[in-house]
């Protein structure tokens, strides 16, 4: 496998591994709507993607969703289930998830119209939070620059 890079470039595809940071590769393995889970770690937070991506061997991808549940609704639902995955992870050194952990999870599935409403609302809130985080990072960089200029 090629070395992953941390900054996206033209012709690069998201590469998901166990870390919180998304890396990028020049090749992809999947072109799907999917929910990605790290297979090892201390927190098991899902990621949502629609499009081309690559996946580390210690990650799970949930895709090919049935007509009863939308991918985005399931993604937001699974974001509330970290306690379940942490509690059911196995291993003494590095907690790991197994396939049966996913298979045993009980999922509450409301009617499709409600799934769309919930997903739309939560998606817009998530986009707003991500935009605010990006602004915060820029402001922190600006602060560091100004502090360096003050003490030269």
Where on the chain are the PLM-derived regions?
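Amphipathic alpha-helical coiled-coil/heptad-repeat segments
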Residues: 106-152
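DNA target-recognition domains and sequence-specific DNA-contacting regions of bacterial/archaeal
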Residues: 1-109
């Amino acid at each position: 496998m090629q070395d992953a890079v941390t900054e996206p470039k033209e012709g690069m595809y998201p590469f998901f591994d166990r870390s919180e940071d998304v890396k990028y590769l020049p090749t992809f393995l999947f072109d799907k709507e999917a929910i990605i889970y790290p297979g090892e770690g201390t927190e098991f937070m899902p990621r949502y993607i629609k499009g081309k991506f690559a996946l580390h061997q210690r990650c799970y991808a949930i895709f090919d969703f049935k007509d009863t549940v939308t991918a985005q609704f399931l993604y937001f639902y699974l974001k509330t289930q970290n306690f379940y995955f942490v509690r059911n992870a196995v291993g003494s050194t590095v907690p790991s998830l197994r396939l049966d952990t996913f298979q045993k999870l009980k999922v509450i599935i409301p009617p499709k119209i409600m799934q769309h409403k919930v997903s739309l609302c939560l998606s817009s809130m998530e986009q707003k939070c991500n935009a605010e985080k990006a602004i915060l990072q820029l402001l922190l960089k600006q602060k560091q620059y100004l502090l360096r200029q003050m003490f030269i």
